[in-house]
Amino acid sequence: IVLLMVVTSNADRICTGITSSNSPHVVKTATQGEVNVTGVIPLTTTPTKSHFANLKGTQTRGKLCPNCLNCTDLDVALGRPKCMGTIPSAKASILHEVKPVTSGCFPIMHDRTKIRQLPNLLRGYENIRLSARNVINAETAPGGPYIVGTSGSCPNVTNGKGFFATMAWAVPKNKNKTARNPLTVEVPYICTKGEDQITVWGFHSDNEIQMVTLYGDSKPQKFTSSANGVTTHYVSQIGGFPNQTEDEGLQQSGRIVVDYMVQKPGKTGTIVYQRGVLLPQKVWCASGRSKVIKGSLPLIGEADCLHEKYGGLNKSKPYYTGEHAKAIGNCPIWVKTPLKLANGTKYRPPAKLLKERGFFGAIAG
């Protein structure tokens, strides 16, 4: 209960308020330090960890292809035969695979390129689609004619031999026609809506016996890609690979190195190669921007805010304390210490004498 006394006289004196009990509220002020007040409104909350959710008012993408069962996002990005599907549009995306890997196709040397980043690159776009046609006719590319190779490690939907939809394994029909001199193929821009074109390519290498059998050359091969001002060079490794399977596939003595290049609208890319090249086929056409945040699946319900440390948050207060991390959506602002808004008077103990002050003195106080 607050008792407010107002005494009116010729001097216009005003008395301060007093409470009938001790005040439990303390606020820190810029000029007076800690001050007891009769009431406060908390402005901060300390969240607890929760599951990630769909962001309210926008489409949120979890897996790149929700309907592609038993597929990692890298499987989808490379076009593994059994992982072909539609990627939904989204304004927000969850980075749920810290180290994405393929789960059932040809063994990839992940650490030699930036291929692990490909799913994250795609997540950063609002709209993503795979081109309907191939960017290059692999059978008649320079150095050909080629046979487009397949592998039992990449079974297609009918369980026959297959390969990634984004690449063609170019095996020369005449294996004795070695590519001693580098060959160059231009990669045209084929997206139709002014999107960024993400072109996937790579190369295959194996032990000396397999290299001679497939390509008629056991020497290390050289490869270069160039697009949008970025040039990358590789030299293949010959042999030294233990037999490896991925997801109960066939054992393979060889490895593939996979990379990608981003082509802006109307810009042509180039690939310089020798034997064992994986020529680009279907390309990703991507546009718009999607905000990306590290998180986990499944997405349950909706939330105002997605926070890397706390998951889905609903904004009950304008500020929060606790762990500071990246957040997207309608999020509270991080502060180091709790904030309070005083909505009462400055507390005066009842036993103290009320000090009368002039009108302007009361305002200044």
Curated annotation (Swiss-Prot):
Keywords carried by this UniProt record: Disulfide bond, Fusion of virus membrane with host endosomal membrane, Fusion of virus membrane with host membrane, Glycoprotein, Hemagglutinin, Host cell membrane, Host membrane, Host-virus interaction, Lipoprotein, Membrane, Palmitate, Signal, Transmembrane, Viral attachment to host cell, Viral envelope protein, Viral penetration into host cytoplasm, Virion, Virus entry into host cell
Protein name: Hemagglutinin
Signal peptide limits: 1-11
Family: Belongs to the influenza viruses hemagglutinin family.
One Pfam family named in its UniProt record: Hemagglutinin
GO molecular function, one term: host cell surface receptor binding
Complex and partners: Homotrimer of disulfide-linked HA1-HA2.
Location, primary (coarse class): virion
Gene name for this UniProt entry: HA
InterPro entries: Capsid_hemagglutn, Hemagglutn_HA1_a/b_dom_sf, Hemagglutn_influenz_A/B
